[in-house]
């Protein structure tokens, strides 16, 4: 165990984390030249295309230090950098003793750098700052060193200058890992205690768990027990990734590896759970386990009603690999049958949609995303959790109060754009908690904001207001009471449930106006008149009329009597009236997206 080092790399999106991981693996000769490719640890196509890491990976590398003349076993645990997956980051850090904090030499410290840094500090990890991309023309390592000192309180002289792309400073990083990060503590003879920090589904092995062994050892044939559910399985394979899956005879205390135990469902092996042996169980679980709670909900509907079963199969198969997604069937009078799905955040939702269409060839209509509201009814003592605005009664007199989820948003921006950012945050009902300067050019703002205001276009607005320089991260705070009303959209007096949503009272009129105008543009004209109305309860607060397409029925009258023309026009009017009574308006997907734009 003296020669084992467990570490992870934490960084803001796009600071070069996956490239650095590739260089470390290459330097230690863990792969041949033939197997080289960019982003080796990003296994999904979508991760490569977007250049983001979604799934965690854990790689075992053997490193021979020429300076110390010693052999080391390094376990690199790669973490996703995106805010939606922050729970996964905290679990992977719990499996390590140290972390490389990667900072882009031209961008400097950004919001997720700070968020992930504090997560590492909470786990008492040894942090090695690495200033990456020093080969860029815009690199300014001295400014970054000052930021490291002032913002993070670390010794700037300990920062390593590197360029993962050019391979500069790689050996220095490896030496720092072996010298500064302590070896893992643990007792091989104690009862087994192992932390699951990731899992995925393999068609041949079943669900595979990536684990860090804290105490004891694990080999094929052992009967394991999971702490949170009490379920038991027999281990069929243990091993490590060297980036390829390699079988090993045993995993001992301090090791990081994978186990397979013919587990049928990924939901049985939850990230953060503790594994122990049935015959000799450990007394206490590793602290910090919680089930990932979906924060954002949206309806997924197949474009063709006949594809409903295919969508169900696709969601079932997909959720085997992604334990964070939840789904339940729901029916909408406007769109038909579909599913109400819960996601960790907006990026997670986009990824699920993209992977459904890519891996299962299914096109879906997505309704506007919403959050989980809590409401207290006057005639009931309990508090209801509501995932869709359709579950909220139209009669607001029955409701005592509504609570919505709030988050603490951290924004780091160049000082020139502070005014723009403050305006956006105030428009989104933000309450300023903190405002400080990190250095002469960079400001940090903290706002308490409703999650509903963030999930639609907040990220895009902040990026465009700061020419792409501002970065943003958020964490869940809790629920607060809000003055919300339900905005119902009616088309020819028929409420369309998929277009209704909750909105703050002060913004109701503005949003209703924007939405009916948007719908007027997107709904195609029919042969009869269409009325689009927005209502709060029984009060109509905005309406638009889409005129009918009409044939010129008086074209055949040459001159002649006015009463003849009037008769033809009256007849046409009667026909249109009848059509309006029985005609159905079909809504295009753009109509649902216009709800987003109005929000």
UniProtKB/Swiss-Prot annotation:
GO cellular component, one term: plasma membrane
Residue spans crossing the bilayer: none
Species name: Hydrogenobaculum sp. (strain Y04AAS1)
Protein name per its UniProtKB record: Elongation factor 4
InterPro entries per UniProt: EF-4, EFG_III/V, EFG_V-like, EFTu-like_2, G_TR_CS, LepA_C_sf, LepA_CTD, LepA_IV
Protein localization: Cell inner membrane
Superkingdom as given in the UniProt entry: Bacteria
GO biological process: positive regulation of translation
């Amino acid at each position: 165990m003296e020669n084992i080092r467990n570490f992870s790399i934490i960084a803001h999106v796009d600071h070069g984390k996956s490239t650095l991981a590739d260089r470390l693996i290459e330097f230690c000769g863990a792969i041949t030249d033939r197997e080289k490719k960019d982003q080796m640890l990003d296994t999904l196509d979508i991760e490569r295309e977007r250049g983001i890491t979604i799934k965690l990976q854990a790689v075992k590398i053997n490193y021979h230090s020429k300076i110390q003349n010693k052999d080391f076993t390094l376990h690199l645990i790669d973490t996703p950098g995106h805010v939606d997956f922050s729970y996964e980051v905290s679990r992977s850090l719990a499996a390590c003793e140290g972390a490389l904090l990667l900072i882009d030499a031209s961008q400097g410290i950004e919001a997720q750098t700070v968020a992930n840094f504090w997560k590492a500090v909470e786990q008492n990890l040894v942090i090695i700052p690495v200033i990456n991309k020093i080969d860029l023309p815009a690199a300014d390592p001295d400014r970054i060193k000052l930021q490291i000192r002032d913002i993070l309180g670390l010794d700037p002289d300990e920062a390593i200058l590197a360029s993962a792309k050019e391979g500069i400073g790689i050996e220095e990083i490896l030496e720092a890992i072996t010298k500064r990060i302590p070896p893992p503590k643990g007792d091989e003879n104690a009862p087994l205690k192992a932390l699951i920090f990731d899992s995925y589904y393999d068609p041949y092995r079943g669900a595979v768990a990536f684990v860090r062994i804290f105490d004891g050892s694990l080999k094929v044939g052992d009967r394991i027990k999971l702490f949170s559910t009490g379920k038991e399985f027999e281990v069929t394979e243990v091993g490590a990734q060297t980036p390829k899956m390699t079988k090993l005879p045993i995993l001992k205390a301090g090791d990081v590896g994978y186990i397979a135990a013919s587990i049928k469902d990924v939901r049985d092996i939850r990230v953060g759970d503790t594994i122990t042996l049935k015959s000799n169980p450990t007394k206490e679980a590793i602290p910090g386990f919680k089930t990932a709670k979906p924060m954002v909900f949206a309806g997924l509907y197949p474009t063709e009603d006949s594809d409903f079963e295919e969508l169900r199969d696709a969601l079932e198969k997909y959720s085997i690999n992604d334990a964070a997604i939840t789904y339940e069937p729901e029916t909408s009078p406007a769109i038909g049958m579909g599913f109400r799905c819960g996601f960790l955040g907006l990026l997670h939702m986009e990824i699920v949609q993209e992977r459904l269409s890519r891996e299962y060839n299914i096109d879906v209509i997505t309704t506007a995303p919403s959050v989980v509201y809590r409401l207290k009814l006057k005639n009931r003592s309990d508090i209801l959790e509501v995932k869709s605005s359709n579950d909220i009664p139209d009669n607001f007199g029955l409701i005592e109060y509504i609570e919505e989820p709030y988050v603490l948003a951290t924004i780091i921006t160049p000082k020139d754009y502070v005014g723009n950012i403050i305006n956006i945050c105030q428009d989104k009902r933000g309450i300023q908690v903190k405002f400080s300067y990190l250095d002469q050019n960079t400001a940090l703002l903290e706002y308490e904001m409703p999650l509903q205001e963030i999930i639609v276009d907040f990220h895009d607005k902040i990026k465009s207001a700061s020419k792409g320089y501002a970065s943003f991260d958020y964490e869940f705070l809790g629920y607060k009471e809000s003055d919300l009303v339900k905005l119902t959209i009616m088309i020819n007096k028929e409420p369309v449930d998929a277009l209704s949503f909750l909105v703050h009272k002060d913004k109701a009129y503005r949003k209703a106006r924007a939405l009916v105008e948007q719908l007027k543009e997107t709904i195609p004209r029919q042969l009869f008149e269409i009325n689009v109305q927005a209502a709060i309860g029984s009060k109509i607060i905005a309406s638009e009329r889409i005129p009918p397409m009409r044939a010129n029925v008086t074209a055949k009258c040459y001159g002649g009597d006015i009463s003849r023309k009037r008769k033809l026009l009256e007849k046409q009017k009667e026909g249109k009236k009848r059509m309006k009574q029985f005609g159905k308006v079909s809504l295009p997907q753009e109509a649902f997206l216009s709800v987003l734009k109005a929000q």
